[in-house]
């Protein structure tokens, strides 16, 4: 699920403890 962080965050995001964090 972490691999889709970039798409969900539109390019800016990190995966922490299995969760997506957008910046």
UniProtKB/Swiss-Prot annotation:
Residues the UniProt record annotates as site (Basic residue of the functional dyad): 14
Compartment(s) of residence: Secreted
One BP term from GO: envenomation resulting in negative regulation of voltage-gated potassium channel activity in another organism
Tissue specificity: Expressed by the venom gland.
SUPFAM superfamilies documented for this protein: Scorpion toxin-like (SSF57095)
Region (Interaction with Ca(2+)-activated K(+) channels): 13-20
MF (Gene Ontology): potassium channel inhibitor activity; toxin activity
Coiled coil, from the record: none
GO cellular component: extracellular region
UniProt-annotated site: Aromatic residue of the functional dyad, residues: 23
Disulfide pattern: 2-15, 5-20, 9-22
UniProt keywords, alphabetically: Disulfide bond, Ion channel impairing toxin, Neurotoxin, Potassium channel impairing toxin, Secreted, Toxin
Domain of life where this protein originates: Eukaryota
InterPro entries listed in its UniProt record: Scorpion_toxin-like_sf
Family: Belongs to the short scorpion toxin superfamily. Potassium channel inhibitor family. Alpha-KTx 13 subfamily.
Domain notes: Has the structural arrangement of an alpha-helix connected to a beta-sheet by disulfide bonds (CSalpha/beta).
Protein role: Blocks reversibly Shaker B potassium channels. Also displaces binding of noxiustoxin to mouse brain synaptosome membranes.
Protein name: Potassium channel toxin alpha-KTx 13.1
Source lineage: Eukaryota, Metazoa, Ecdysozoa, Arthropoda, Chelicerata
